[in-house]
Amino acid sequence: MAVFLWRNLFQTTKARMLQQRRASLYNGAHDYDEELIKKKLQQFAGGSINLSKEHSGIGILTLNNSRLMNAFTGTMMLELQERVTELENWKDGKGLIICGAGNTFCSGSDLNAVKAISNSQDGMNMCMFMQNTLTRLMRLPLISIALIQGKALGGGAELTTACDFRLMTPGSEIRFVHKHMGLVPGWGGAARLVRIIGSRAALQLLSRAHGVDPERALHLGLSEGTLSSSDETGSLEEARAWLSQYTEGPASVIQAVKKVVTAGRELPLEAALRTEKDVFGTVWGGPANLEALTRRQK
């Protein structure tokens, strides 16, 4: 009976939290038509978003459009949403590394797509679409790293802020270039940047639009460290090793840890406490907890 009740509680809580993570920030009341913007984005093809899920519970999400420094085309934006949905359903997942192909991270949006949707409504729809996707990415119950090689520019810089941690390689750079394009971040990058490094430092980075090298990023708290390797294979192996210190243990427990931290960051205190209680209930008396209690008795 106890096992049945635990499983029922776990499934109910899991379903409710999954629904909350997928909830759109915007709807028709905001003049947001997701199907319309999907049709528009579908017109701008090129590149891909590749996902490999390893037996260790680590996912590798690769931006692949090396001809344009891994800039997001319209179809890549759509594929990113699909990959996030896939990761939301990955019950064995523990961690995620986001990287770019060809020793560079991401140069933002494909300018051909930007020019074609330069009217206000299309731009707003694209903004809302990417905010939805990157918010869901940030809320994944996986511990995530942006592995920054080469350049992370504009929207690429914004993408790094949707990850829990950032690791940089020698000679890499994060740069919020939006001001030089007559813009501000539109994919949620400004709001997330303020939460990562504070409002004063965020204002400096956005208003000066200067590049941030690994040393300064570490000083600002924008990066957790600089890897020793700058090549694609070596840096990925280093990132895996770095992430492993946080992902040791059962996937259910790692995901629970991420969920309570996300709740504490985003929700008012009372709501965060209720979420913590619900998540606690999914692991209390669960397999990992019972195994740990058995080990302690020996």
Swiss-Prot record:
Family label: Belongs to the enoyl-CoA hydratase/isomerase family.
Location in or out of the cell: Cytoplasm, Cytosol
GO molecular function: carboxy-lyase activity; methyl/ethyl malonyl-CoA decarboxylase activity
Tagged with keyword Coiled coil: no
Protein name: Ethylmalonyl-CoA decarboxylase
The keyword Lyase belongs to this UniProt entry's keyword annotation: yes
Pfam family, one: ECH_1
Enzyme class at the top of the EC tree: lyase
Keywords from the named record: Cytoplasm, Lyase
Single Gene Ontology BP annotation: fatty acid beta-oxidation
Gene Ontology terms: cellular component: cytosol
Reaction(s) catalysed by this chain's protein: (2S)-ethylmalonyl-CoA + H(+) = butanoyl-CoA + CO2; (S)-methylmalonyl-CoA + H(+) = propanoyl-CoA + CO2; (2R)-ethylmalonyl-CoA + H(+) = butanoyl-CoA + CO2
EC number assigned by the record: 4.1.1.94
Coiled coil: none
Protein purpose: Decarboxylates ethylmalonyl-CoA, a potentially toxic metabolite, to form butyryl-CoA, suggesting it might be involved in metabolite proofreading. Acts preferentially on (S)-ethylmalonyl-CoA but also has some activity on the (R)-isomer. Also has methylmalonyl-CoA decarboxylase activity at lower level.
